[in-house]
Amino acid sequence: MASNGAAAGAMAPFFPPNFLLQMQQPLPLHHQHLQDHAHGGHGGHHLLPPPPPSLSPFLPDLAMDAPPPPMYEASGGDGGGGGAASEDEEDGCGGGGGGGGGEKKRRLSVEQVRTLERSFESGNKLEPERKAQLARALGLQPRQVAIWFQNRRARWKTKQLEKDFDALRRQLDAARAENDALLSLNSKLHAEIVALKGGAAAAGGGGSSCRQEAASELINLNVKETEASCSNRSENSSEINLDISRPAPPPPPPPANESPVNRGIPFYASIGRGGAGGVDIDQLLLRGGHSPSPAAVTTPPPPKMELGITGNGGGADAAAAGAGSFGGLLCGAVDEQPPFWPWADGHHHFH
């Protein structure tokens, strides 16, 4: 140090000619001795003596180019070989019994990894029985098998998420492309509609008015037909009402030559005027049919009623009684008994 101070004190304002040659020479021996003593004596102490000050700020410091001290190298290490281990080998790490920091990791062999992969493909959930069976078959501890399955399951989930993400991304791209195509088609169709509307308005402006007029005329014709049918119905109903409102015609007057006695019973009176002896209704009925049988001849006839007018000039009471009995005979009213029994000779003898 004294020599350095003397050299610095005797230095001229300008550098001597051999200054560069002196700077390229190695450090003095006493500096190297001090560095070796510091490394060897303290045994890896972190504090080092400061390097000598640089004589010139423009020249590189030779002390910075020196190799790093050997104190940073890990003692008893494997030389950084753990960084080159694969994922499958790292899955099998974990130490046999929870070892310390300096314990070397145990790596799985290729055959063990293949066996574990086949077991994981069969089922990603590890049961205690299967865990113990795999540990015995592979010569591993159950904790190592459980840790490997846990790490493998995490990687499998990550890969599944990546696959799902890729599938969703493809679906999104396809949906966007389809949406863009639909939007372009929609705009094209809108343009065609606008063009068609403009062409129709320019070329056939009167066509729409003609169609509207024809439609209005058709509506008017339908209205007229409806009104005509309604008027016809009203006329028919008025005629029916008039016919109903008219009084019934009076009956025709009776002829003047007809007697008031026969005016009520014209048919029976004509029958009653047959002769003095009268007309027998049963005889008229028998004449129209077959000839009377012997039984009919021998059997006495039922009591007859003479409808003719008697010689004593019986009035309208006798004619009305005869008409009533004749109507009862024709209608089958045989249960009613006549008020009197007429005689066939036509003369009544009153004693």
Swiss-Prot record:
It is found in: Nucleus. This is Homeobox-leucine zipper protein HOX23. GO terms for cellular component: nucleus. GO terms for biological process: positive regulation of DNA-templated transcription. Residues 228-240 have a biased composition (Polar residues). Residues 159-203 are annotated as: Leucine-zipper. Belongs to the HD-ZIP homeobox family. Class I subfamily. Residues 114-128 have a biased composition (Basic and acidic residues). Keywords: DNA-binding, Homeobox, Nucleus, Transcription, Transcription regulation. The keyword Phosphoprotein does not apply. GO terms for molecular function: DNA-binding transcription factor activity, RNA polymerase II-specific; sequence-specific DNA binding. Residues 34-128, 227-263 are annotated as: Disordered. Expressed in seedlings, roots, stems, leaf sheaths and panicles. Residues 56-65 have a biased composition (Low complexity). Residues 101-160 bind DNA. Signal peptide: none annotated. InterPro entries: HD (IPR001356), HDZip_class_I_plant (IPR045224), Homeobox_CS (IPR017970), Homeodomain-like_sf (IPR009057), HTH_motif (IPR000047), Leu_zip_homeo (IPR003106). It holds the Pfam family Homeodomain. Probable transcription factor. PROSITE patterns: HOMEOBOX_1, HOMEOBOX_2.
